[in-house]
A protein has these predicted regions:
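Secretory-pathway glycoprotein ectodomains that are cysteine- and/or Ser/Thr/Pro-rich
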Residues: 2-4
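Aromatic-lined carbohydrate-binding surfaces of glycoside hydrolases
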Residues: 7-252, 283-296
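Substrate-binding groove of N-acetylhexosamine-processing glycoside hydrolases
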Residues: 32, 77, 126-134, 138, ...
Length: 521
């Protein structure tokens, strides 16, 4: 059923730079494409890729150099030339792993094992956050809005009834908030909460309010946006009394394809009744399926946007919807593995933006997206090129290689090679321990494993060559180690173990020469 198109307001694309930060040349090509797709703003999450200086220089990435000051300015200037507003996202409470992992910052953790959450009681913590913000604002001339994060101020624990750890923070729905096991667990928080009438909700709100007030004192005209999830369970009265009314604009995020429209509308209306009528939505075009997904499902993310269109259509006139941020996480958090990278998420992004523009994702809309990107299918796993014009889809060759390699890695013949009939029947752990095997069958197993390794090696090298053109070399290395090496290792081990066993049973002068396998570590 068709909904009205997305109402007026910003359409922000989220640039998550804490994983696989694009090289500047590629970043500018992406911004050019975003502009053609109807994007009019960027939500930029620098994390350790920002060129912090002074006492904060230790926050800079070490796996690859952060963006230079000149690169940050170039990105902004180019975005503005395309009619885009740039809104930096700087975490100020939760998801501060990239700060609190450093030894000099350990004392600012809420509790020692919790590397994500800032201690809300330390004045040094607020000073740290404000210095981070000061440096970011200084390097964004004419900045009008800041996003201060403040989501997931906790370590999440999911109940068994919700599927255990199969779901991550970013995929829980409004029905299943995660239990807070970090915030309020520190000794100072326990003392603070021991006073009558104090609650964990007040503890969270007091810190966010302090930060927001400090921002307004420093930059009175600055618009402050924050994630809403920590406020979802709070009453209207609690929000009214928080001191946040008039200071912040909540951004409600839900990335699920079956987003509950009624519940989401109810939440937005609650925020509005509490006095926070300027509100934002946040959807997802990639990075919200599972922590290790490599290729996004376009349909899954289109479905998420279809639900958001229903939400927008059902809101009362009192809700002033400022826009929507279409998120594209490269990691779930600073310490997790890389998930879907930008190049392979572009078909999904284009499809989601077209859905917002038309109110549905009709066959005509699909054709328009395919034509815009020069592909035959909007699903990355099935895309084929219809033109050789690379400018239509920056990073298309890398996207193709990612899809091809991902398919190879997930083929049952390769992923479950150790469990096939011949390995289990003629090269079991018992055979290996005794070094007593059927040489002919063992060498046939080895030949097949070597063939798979060669095919993977060729595809990996092609992907590596293409990836380092768009991302830092460290990104290519990490992606391969995380996503490829676990599949290669069993194949490499089998070929080596077969050689050792066969050498015990066949004269070395008549053994066939086998290709040496490469390590991708």
């Amino acid at each position: 059923m068709k909904s009205p198109p997305w109402p007026k307001g910003k359409k922000l694309v989220h640039l998550d730079l804490k994983g696989a930060p694009p090289r500047l040349e590629y970043l500018l090509k992406l911004i050019e494409l975003f502009s053609k797709l109807g994007v009019n703003g960027l939500l930029v999450e620098y994390e350790d890729m920002f060129p912090y200086d002074g006492d904060l220089k230790l926050l800079q990435a070490t796996a690859q150099p952060p963006y230079s000051r000149e690169e940050v300015l170039s990105m902004q200037e180019f975005a503005k030339s395309k009619g885009m507003e740039v809104i930096p996202l700087v975490q100020t409470f939760g998801h501060m792993e990239f700060v609190l992992k450093h030894r000099p910052m350990w004392s600012l953790r809420e509790m020692a094992p919790c590397v994500s959450t800032l201690n809300p009681h330390r004045k040094e913590g607020v000073r740290l956050v404000m210095e981070m913000l000061r440096q970011v604002v200084e390097l964004h001339p004419g900045l009008n809005a800041l996003h201060i994060g403040a989501d997931e101020v906790r370590i999440g624990v999911l109940s068994d009834s919700y599927g255990g750890l199969r779901h991550h923070f970013f995929t829980y729905s409004l029905y299943h908030p995660l239990r807070c096991t970090c915030l309020a667990r520190g000794e100072e928080s326990k003392l603070w909460l021991a006073s009558p009438g104090r609650t964990v909700e007040q503890l969270f709100l007091s810190h966010v309010t302090k930060v927001a007030q400090a921002i307004k004192e420093a930059w009175p005209d600055m618009t402050i946006i924050m994630w809403d999830d920590m406020m979802r369970g709070m009453s209207q009265d609690t929000l009214k009394a928080s001191g946040l009314v008039g200071l912040v604009q909540p951004m409600l995020w839900d990335y699920t394809p079956n987003l509950d429209v009624d519940t989401t509308v109810s939440l937005l209306e609650k925020y509005c009744r509490a006095g926070m009528s300027d509100l934002w939505a946040a959807s997802s075009f990639k990075g919200s399926t599972s922590v290790h997904t490599c290729v996004p499902s376009t349909q899954r993310h289109v479905d998420n946007h279809v639900q958001w269109l229903k939400v927008a259509a059902a809101l009362s006139a009192a809700v002033n919807l400022q826009g929507i941020a279409i998120t594209g996480w490269q990691r779930y958090d600073h310490l997790s593995v890389l998930c879907e990278l930008m190049h392979v998420g572009l078909p999904s992004l284009a499809a989601c933006l077209q859905t917002l523009s038309l109110g549905e994702f009709s066959p005509e809309a699909q054709s328009k997206v395919a034509e815009t990107l020069g592909i035959s299918s909007v699903e990355a796993e099935a895309m084929g090129r219809t033109t050789e014009d690379e400018s239509l889809f920056p990073g298309r060759r890398l996207a193709e290689l990612t899809v091809e390699l991902n398919s190879l890695l997930n083929s049952e013949d390769i992923r479950f090679f150790e469990n096939n009939m011949y390995v289990r029947g003629w090269f079991s752990s018992y055979h290996q321990q005794r070094k007593m095997v059927s040489p002919l069958i063992a060498m046939q197993i080895q030949s097949q494993a070597s063939a798979y390794l060669t095919a993977l090696q060729e595809k990996v090298e092609a992907l590596r060559e293409e990836m380092v053109l768009l991302y830092p070399e460290s990104t290519a290395q990490e992606w391969i180690v995380e996503h490829v090496s676990p599949v290669l290792a069993p194949l490499q081990r089998i070929t080596e173990d077969i050689t050792a066993c066969v050498n015990e049973m066949v004269p070395s002068n008549i053994l066939p020469a086998h290709n040496q396998t490469a390590s991708f570590e």
